[in-house]
């Protein structure tokens, strides 16, 4: 029996196919690892959390849904610190973008490593980190949950920085190109945030004309893509 995932977790699961090992950081109840194993999307999962309470809950849910299994290993870990096994995919969901970036910064990943990240806030800070640390965002999907709109980012560590436009701090190229209803909602949300920032810059006593011009350009690009 597999758990029913939230839209955010389902979006992550949809990005995973035919993998050997997936590590889920901040796993809580281990819903995602249980689902991935139930659907045979990977051969093994590591369910990691920083606290013993969530890990204990995870172990109970794993046995409830899958019985005794060696396909999910629970690990007490602060971020990626104690993830010693090579993993095809690392997932981190339900945390702020800055926190996710700190996890990745504290434990540099090898070239070719895939990460799937779902920031609850400060997504622009996470994208900025990814671009500055040689990650290529190969896909980004907008997803609605509880009347809010989020994004899920799949990125791969590459050997060098990839060229990006200024707008891609706020929304990556893959999501910018999408036209589904959630993508449009996400673009509208980002556009309102950029307009608010632009308004503040324009009202400042000491105007930064370069930043104003950049934000105007970003607004124009977003309006064109909605």
Where do the PLM segments sit?
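Conserved S-adenosyl-L-methionine
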Residues: 25-26, 38-44
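Active-site capping/gating segments
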Residues: 46, 50-53, 122-128, 132-165
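An accessory alpha-helical subdomain
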Residues: 163-226
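Conserved beta-strand signature within the Rossmann-like core of class I S-adenosyl-L-methionine
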Residues: 111-123
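S-adenosyl-L-methionine
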Residues: 1-19, 34, 56-85
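Glycine-rich SAM-binding Motif I of class I
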Residues: 30
